[in-house]
């Protein structure tokens, strides 16, 4: 463990490094900021919140279930998740209006703000600022973070809760207690992860302080957050509908060996090789070090429970286990601290300026190497540019007044962004029988590179509108290309 006392130059260097990382995210994310919502996780999630925002203002607070309505995509208010993100979208739209950039603003800003929040959290854990900075670099240098760090509020609510509670536990001033209570309310009312994690954090605080103003304030904040969730669910889809949704998440039609293989495939896609090699040591170090042991244990429990209980979510969504990045963060910070301490002992430079220069130069060299391995251009094209083609295609087509449903094949899943753009419900055509019910002049959206078995691949030559991998044809044309259909 390195000494926690740091010179003013060292503090300045770490602040510069953290600012550079936040700026890197801002600049590298900007190209996707103005792209239309399309066939991606971002398109599906933010398309949903675009509907929440639109319905709140068009239907009113009560009729829209306080923003939970996402008609016409679904008639049942969406209250499966705590309400803070929905409320934030409504608030932003009240200030700066509705639109594509307003929809994306919260997610992108939250992603950038997570960087200084992680730095503050790491320092409150008692880890040196240089080590925390390197751990942040390792986190943002993963495709998992670069792609999904801008989706919703991400890690931000829980990072704020952890950091402020640890700060208040060490030195419980009135101001820190207020910040910890507000952050706890925010995290609980923002995500189920926050609901799960809060009792662990409270227990650790109670062990140190027993019942005092801080522990009682945290109880009050979490209860208030829980009441907000209860109201949100009750006035929206209802507890029974939430139960049905949970039931869908725990159902499975796969084996656990298939599940493990699928998670491994996701990890290989979203995590670089160097990160996976260091992941196990990071877990062990996080558990060994007394400063990070309890937090690492709590976060491991959270990741395991959310992966294995609502396991169908982890089966379907590659981003489901995203919080694992936060779980490994403390361990990577401690490992970095050990390495920095070892290097300091070996180089034995007497000049602080030389040490500062080597530190900054080493950080920039490491950052450059890790960022180069990200292959940002390829990630941007695969996860944003190519999928936004679907949004551009939909935007270029004016739906006829006679078409009341946006038809699509299953290979374009959960297209909330289509409902948002065309203002009609969507329906997936699972087979030729479903296609047979579609009015002949209605258009159908599909992916050219993912033609289902019941369609002839020659349909590619009958396409009427196309953008990238996405295309539309009228139903009567698609019916002519059903496998075995008479021409």
Residues covered by each model-derived region:
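Membrane-lumen/periplasm interface segments of specific transmembrane helices
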Residues: 214-257, 275-281
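Short periplasmic/luminal acceptor-recognition loop of GT-C membrane glycosyltransferases, typified by
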Residues: 380-384, 396-433, 442-448
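Membrane-interface alpha helices of multi-pass inner-membrane proteins
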Residues: 135-136, 166-167, 176-192, 198-201
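Transmembrane-helix motifs of polytopic, lipid-linked glycan transferases
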Residues: 102-126, 163
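Hydrophobic, aromatic-rich transmembrane alpha-helices
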Residues: 113-116, 202-206, 271-296
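Extracytosolic helix-loop segments that constitute the early lumenal/periplasmic catalytic or substrate-binding loops
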Residues: 30-34, 46-76, 84
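Signature aromatic-anchored transmembrane alpha helix within multi-pass, membrane-resident enzymes
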Residues: 18, 130, 178, 182, ...
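Short acidic/glycine- and proline-prone juxtamembrane loop motifs at membrane-interface regions
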Residues: 144-156
């Amino acid at each position: 463990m390195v000494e926690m006392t740091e010179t003013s130059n060292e503090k300045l260097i770490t602040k510069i490094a953290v600012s550079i990382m936040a700026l890197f995210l801002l600049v590298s994310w900007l190209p996707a900021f103005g792209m239309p919502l399309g066939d991606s996780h971002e398109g599906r999630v933010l398309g949903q919140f675009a509907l929440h925002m639109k319905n709140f203002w068009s239907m009113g607070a009560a009729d829209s279930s306080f923003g939970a309505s996402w008609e016409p995509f679904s008639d049942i208010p969406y209250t499966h998740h705590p309400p803070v993100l929905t409320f934030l979208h409504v608030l932003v739209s009240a200030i700066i209006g509705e639109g594509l950039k307003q929809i994306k603003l919260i997610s992108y800003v939250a992603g950038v703000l997570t960087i200084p929040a992680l730095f503050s959290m790491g320092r409150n854990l008692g880890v040196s600022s240089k080590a925390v900075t390197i751990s942040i670099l390792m986190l943002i240098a993963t495709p998992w973070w670069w792609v999904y760090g801008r989706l919703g509020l991400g890690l931000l609510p829980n990072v704020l809760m952890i950091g402020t509670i640890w700060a208040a536990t060490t030195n419980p001033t009135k101001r820190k207690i207020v910040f910890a209570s507000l952050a706890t309310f925010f995290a609980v009312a923002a995500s189920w992860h926050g609901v799960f994690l809060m009792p662990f954090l409270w227990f650790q605080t109670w062990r140190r302080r027993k019942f005092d103003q801080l522990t009682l304030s945290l109880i009050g904040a979490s209860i208030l957050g829980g009441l907000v969730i209860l109201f949100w669910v009750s006035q929206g889809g209802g507890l029974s509908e939430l139960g049905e949704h949970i039931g869908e998440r725990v159902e499975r039609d796969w084996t656990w060996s298939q599940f493990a293989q699928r998670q491994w495939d996701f990890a290989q896609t979203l995590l670089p090789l160097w990160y996976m090699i260091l992941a196990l040591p990071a877990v062990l170090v996080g558990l060994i070090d007394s400063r990070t042991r309890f937090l690492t244990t709590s976060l491991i429990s959270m990741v395991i429970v959310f992966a294995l209980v609502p396991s169908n979510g982890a089966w379907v969504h590659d981003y489901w286990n995203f919080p694992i990045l936060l779980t490994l963060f403390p361990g990577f910070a401690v490992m970095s601290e050990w390495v920095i301490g070892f290097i300091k002992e070996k180089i034995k430079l007497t000049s602080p300026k030389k040490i500062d220069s080597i530190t900054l130069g080493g950080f920039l060299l490491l950052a450059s190497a890790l960022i180069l391995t990200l292959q940002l251009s390829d990630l941007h094209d695969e996860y944003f540019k190519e999928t936004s083609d679907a949004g551009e295609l939909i935007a270029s087509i004016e739906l006829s007044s006679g078409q009341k449903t946006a038809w699509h094949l299953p290979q374009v899943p959960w297209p909330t962004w289509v409902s948002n753009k065309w203002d009609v419900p969507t329906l997936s055509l699972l087979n030729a029988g479903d296609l047979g019910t579609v009015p002949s002049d209605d258009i159908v959206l599909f992916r050219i590179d993912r033609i289902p078995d019941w369609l002839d691949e020659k349909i590619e030559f009958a396409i009427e509108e196309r953008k990238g991998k996405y295309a539309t044809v009228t139903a009567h044309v698609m019916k002519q290309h059903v496998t075995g259909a008479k021409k």
